[in-house]
Amino acid sequence: MPKYYDKLLRKLQKRPLSQNEFSSLLCELGGLLVEPQIELEIIKTSGIPLLFAHNKVYLRTTLTPYLQESFCIVDIETNGHNPYIHQPIEIGAIHYQNGEIKETFHSFIFCQNIPQKITEITGITNSMLQDSPKIHQVLESFKLFLKDSIFVAHNVDFDFNFLSNACYCNHFGYLYNPRLCTIKLAQKTLQSPKYSLGFLNDFLGIHHHTLHRALEDSKITLEIFKKCLKQLDKNIYTSYDLLKFTNSKSILQGNLNEN
């Protein structure tokens, strides 16, 4: 994913910006021909969680208690491992906020090339996808579901980068949502010899029976996420605190740090 908005995000992580500062930064990012209002509308659809109040622009995650934050727990199945030559074939997602599941999302995606190995892992066949909606339609619906929630997944870079690249290739732009990896968070909060989704499913007593299907795997990920949140220190209060803690290099003492 390009780092187009990185400078903007770094500044907003440190402090809110005045409207004038924010507009000037948009012009700096976009060049001489940029229209700040148009650039703002693009940013709003990119997943960056902005908050406008009292003539200032805030990064919402720096203010929102994580217990009130909007999280989107995501899992995908794909027809290969390379986001530049393969595609998502199934998306499952859960909107989780205030300790409740607000809504779920699930869709297959039309594809004519499912390798036998992928069918063996997921059970998804070419025939199952022949009447499914095209990828552009599914991604449009998914972006409306995701909005500016924090994107949560087990090994988040895989799911996020796959979907972000697919969005870009289908003219929706890259995703810039904050992202949280439940492998990293679990390594800092849960004592376990391994951290794969399948292992934690059994080790933590979740016991969902279906693996390698998008919505079911997102349900397992949510249960892992909830167990992690219960172990957080009280000094972790905002969503930004949670993201910073998750991405820190420390791990829970005694863990073997295996995936």
For the regions a protein language model found, what residue spans apply to each?
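Short alpha-helix plus adjacent loop in nuclease-associated cores
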Residues: R179-S196
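Acidic, divalent-metal-coordinating active-site segment for phosphoryl/phosphodiester hydrolysis
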Residues: R213-K226
